[in-house]
Amino acid sequence: MENKFFLRLSFLAFAFLPFVLTAQSRKDRHLSSAEVLGVRADASVASAAPVQKLDTASIRRMGVTSTADALRRFAGVNLRDYGGAGGLKTVSVRGLGAQHTAVVYDGVTVSNAQQGQIDLGRFSLDRLAGVELHTADEGNLLVPVRQLGAATVVLRSWQPNAQNRGMHGAVALRHGSFGVWNPSVLLSQNWNGRTAVNVSADYYHGNNAYPFTVKNGVATHREKRLNSQMNDWTLEANAHHLLRRGQLSGKVFYVTNHRYLPGPVTLYVSGNNEHLTEQNAFVQLRWEQQYGRWNFFGAGKADWRESKYLDIAGRYPGGRLDQRYKQGEIYASAGASYVWQTLTAAVATDWFRNDLTSNLKVDNDVWRTSWLTSMTLRYAPRHFELTGRLVSSIFRNHATAGTEAAKNASQLSPSLSASWKLMSDQRAHLFVRAHYKEFFRVPTFTENYYYHLGNTHLKPERTQQLGAGVTFAGMLSARWQVQLTADGYVNRVWDKISSIPYNLFVWRTVNLGKVRAAGLDVALHSTWTLRNGQQLIGNGTYTYQRVTDRTDKTSEDYGKQLAYTPLHSGAVSMAWENPWVNAVVSMTAASKRWATNEHTVTTSVPAYADVNLGLYRTFRFRSFQLEARADLTNLFNHQYEVIRRYPMPGRAYRFSALLRW
């Protein structure tokens, strides 16, 4: 199976080779006088910490079909996907775990104090103008402290343009296999050239009853994925006001989601009767202002979240398990920076309060107050940049009478990053970088308080990150532009929070374990400009991750790869843009994984390669623009699993039309 996986990977790579050779073999390199030779190094190229970005053009050219799929194209990302639209989708970066990945939506962090991880399937790709991944340290100095995670996913929605006068809008309709329908609408209005508002609505429905094959020895049987239906409504409003040397933005967001949770497939039993209904609403404001050498920002957010979990099964008293949770958060952040020649100093502070209530008799109300402060200093002469940051974190836990509150926590977390510009001219840029960072996370409410599982005596999970890398961006010829990034790293985790069996029926969450992650991330972007308005855009990422248990040398699991962490993974895409119909072929792949830390035949999860094909074109008439697209996913109808016993969909189609004015 491993050999077949790498044969497919090699075949697709060689399939792209003729396009590359065609672009390089053209001897006529003459350019018109209007063309300018050169490449500009943007902030991500010169950053002292790795930054990966996708804008709407890149998303279109790479055949990306969802927000989770976009993140899967980044190097160093390990996506956990339980299959179908209703399956949970979270990301772990460089082996540190999903709880160490912060998610930022339009400048303010998205939180879930109960679970500690964000389901990225809830963010529709249609509402996003860009997706970024910041690994290790944040390149921007003046940011809320809360987004300074071990890794940060930055999501940017379409913002109203205060300088684009009049009424503008967009309507879209998407339809796909397995009963997927996804209409959406966005309206934007500018009143006076300084103030603009947009309102959007999005509905998603999917039956997700896709077929799959069950194997039992030599016998096979075809089944359909059951209990995977999802309905999702999202409403969002954004306001943007231009100030003199500043801006003020606000967001109101509401989503309600009802999904059936598909259970694991065990031989011929795939039925499940679990339901999850979630509601989330928040209001956030962000202010930015510049006064001479000073820059200021302020942000605030009020967040409410409710989830209702229902499992109908005979093993429960009364035949059902009904759990209801409510979360609330109040959040405030402010900061300032001062620039003096080659020195920049910044300070920011965050305060937030999270609370959780439930209908469980064994639980009482619990809440946590947090105060984070960061102090940053950057020295940036012409060809060198050195940034040091110190983060102070204080967490105080509280509970109503009768419930023991979790342990309080406080810590200082330093980080240091540097970037050197070895070469920079009109045609090429070469940067090298290095970083060191310490970070920790406090236990989630579930890890602290959940019945039979929680432990109020848990210590924070601590991490240490060390890495170095190089980025080259340049014009290799008059028509060939390349950007290549390579980063190596070693990460360590102490006091890792894990759940272990306490007896035959009860599990317990404890600080048990040390983890070491050593890896290599490589990313390549290349553009070949051809004749007659044609170009080839190639993208590729490769990740090597050796993430092992380093807890007990006498244990059988010592030195073994952690569960659901492939040793090799990657993605590749090639788009051909032309005056007729644009085409893109893409592939994501991962080597063999293990469902647990015990490496046996029964816990092995085979390697996979998922190939997609897309066609798209934009039509323009008067002030209207129509984008039409057709995608075929899992082209070879390969059945695979990202999570064991949760089969992914086979071959599927997807049609979409987007009208803008």
State where each predicted segment sits.
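Short, acidic, small-residue-rich periplasmic hinge/interaction motif at the N-terminus
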Residues: 23-60, 68, 98
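A beta-strand signature from Gram-negative outer-membrane beta-barrel systems
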Residues: 123-170
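Flexible loop and strand-edge segments within Gram-negative outer membrane beta-barrel domains
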Residues: 208-212, 221-232, 245-296, 300-329, ...
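Membrane-embedded beta-barrel scaffold of Gram-negative outer-membrane proteins
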Residues: 297-311, 432-437, 461-518, 523-527, ...
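Gram-negative outer-membrane beta-barrel transporters
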Residues: 342, 380-386, 483, 487-492, ...
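Surface-exposed extracellular loop regions of Gram-negative outer-membrane beta-barrel proteins
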Residues: 394-399, 406, 420-467, 488-510, ...
